């Protein structure tokens, strides 16, 4: 008796399921990194929106703005986005803090900074891990890595290549 088999055998189905599982295991971490980078890009975009106000304040007053109000921008809690809790200007350093909910777990509550230094009569901007500047006075361009930033730094793999400057960059 010759029977004609139609469809897939159990072994064939198990092999297909195993292949799909392996592909999902490889793709999921890459997707998580992609979503974190996309969320960090919102923080950079909001922080970069404050650069012109900080630069203008510096060029007009000869010192860095001490806070959001003196820079002429909205308060830190008013500058926010879907993934960004706040953007603060302090002594010319613009720091964005990620939100603590609806954000990739690897970047929850973490920070990044944009800061400027005088260079040949103009202002050059840098972007990277959180930094602080002690004083707003024009003679002080130095920034230091934020002391309380341990555990609050965004992993370098989630920062775009244009935002990986060290605090001692010049």
Curated annotation (Swiss-Prot):
Transmembrane segments: 8-28
Gene disruption: observed consequences: Deletion mutants are unpiliated but nevertheless form biofilms showing that attachment and accumulation of cells did not depend on pilus expression.
Example of a GO cellular component annotation carried by this entry: pilus
Topology relative to the membrane: Single-pass membrane protein
Chief site of localization: other
Modified residues (N-methylphenylalanine): 8
Modified residues (O-(sn-1-glycerophosphoryl)serine): 100
Protein name from the UniProt record: Fimbrial protein
Gene: pilE
